[in-house]
């Protein structure tokens, strides 16, 4: 799904680094997969993959399964990790993350 945008080896390393429950930190993950240095267009493509229901927003249920976009066997985020992730990205407080909010969070 991320071919041409992100390297498989970077994704594998990033997933390995957050295997333990409670260890996911979005900023570290974005850096490890190489997303921080990508263009706005590439970040938008990644957002489109994570936005499973194509609502133009990433909601809490999609964030919970965030890692599974990168590997089907990856774990779901814990409720605490999901809440922290949502709070970090939801700058306007509407309970979901839009593409501009996602891009701002990636660039951190």
From Swiss-Prot:
Keywords, alphabetical: Acetylation, Allergen, Calcium, Metal-binding, Muscle protein, Repeat
Residue positions binding Ca(2+) 2: 90, 92, 94, 96, 101
TM region positions: none
Role description: In muscle, parvalbumin is thought to be involved in relaxation after contraction. It binds two calcium ions.
Gene3D superfamilies on file: EF-hand
Family: Belongs to the parvalbumin family.
GO cellular component, as recorded: cytoplasm
SUPFAM superfamilies in UniProt: EF-hand (SSF47473)
Residues reported to bind Ca(2+) 1: 51, 53, 55, 57, 59, 62
Domain EF-hand: 38-73, 77-108
N-acetylalanine: residues bearing it: 1
GO molecular function, one term: calcium ion binding
InterPro entries: EF-hand-dom_pair, EF_Hand_1_Ca_BS, EF_hand_dom, Parvalbumin
Comment field (misc): Is regarded as an important allergen.
Name of the protein: Parvalbumin beta 2
Keyword Hydrolase: no
Superkingdom of this protein's organism: Eukaryota
